Amino acid sequence: MRFSKRPSVDAQAVEDASGAVLYARDLNAQGRKGMIFGPLDMDLAPRQLAVIHGPAGAGKSALLLALCGRFRRTRGTLIIDGIDAMAEPYRAIQRTSVARIGDYVVPEDRLTLNESVAERCHLDAVNLKKAESRVRQIEEIVG
């Protein structure tokens, strides 16, 4: 998702997604070498399970990151728990979590350690001063 050029909230898509925890329409991503995944339409209801499978290099990891609102090249419509993830990516990722997927989910190079801590605190509604204090304690323990 491009955070610099956010589209306006798609009110019709949010209404269409009513009751779904995940709603995707024409979700896709392209890279320098072509299509990474998609286009994909998907509705996921509460307590429903979705399985993503395919051969290595098919775009599964990118798709899973996109479905959590964490893949910047994503295009299309993505509603996560009533939030338009294309228009409000930071609100959407507060509702999602990603387990470690190889080296894909790592701290962003553009952020310092302090900025990474501040971003996580903002997303998790944790008091920044308390978190900074905890980081200092950890630094003292680990050296």
Where are the regions a protein language model picked out?
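Conserved ABC transporter NBD signature motif
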Residues: G76-D84
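Conserved lysine of the Walker
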Residues: K60
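The feature captures the beta-strand-to-loop junction immediately N-terminal to the Walker
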Residues: H53-P55
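Q-loop/switch helix immediately C-terminal to the Walker
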Residues: R95, G102, D109-V126, R134-Q137
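Conserved N-terminal strand/loop that marks the beginning of ABC ATPase nucleotide-binding domains
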Residues: D16-Q30
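ABC ATPase NBD coupling module
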Residues: D84-A99
